[in-house]
Amino acid sequence: YLSAHGRYTTIHLRDSQKHITTKSIGEIEELLPENNFIRIHHSHIINVDFLYKIIKNDGYIVELSDNTQLNVSRRKQEDLMQFLKNM
């Protein structure tokens, strides 16, 4: 998954490695294949191949296969559900 930190983006890899880039998360989003990646929050993009489950609480939380949990913003909840429905 990817996480934004100001003007930097951290790319989190399967093996717990992290790479930091000076590209914004928006710039990277434009380069990613749309059928594998979805933006779930202003600060997060996930690879749906590693989506383990969705937890509904007050909002939605995605849990990835490495047990990472990320909040889904209210504005992105419907996008996520539609994306998964169309897979």
Predicted regions, residues:
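Eukaryotic intrinsically disordered, low-complexity regulatory linkers and tails enriched in Ser/Thr/Pro
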Residues: L64-D66, R74, E78-M87
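Conserved binding/recognition cores within well-folded domains
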Residues: Y1-S65
